Swiss-Prot record:
To P.gingivalis hemagglutinin A. This is 44 kDa immunogenic protein.
């Protein structure tokens, strides 16, 4: 993946 999706 081009970026890591994070939930904050």
């Amino acid at each position: 993946a081009p970026y890591q999706k994070r939930n904050i």
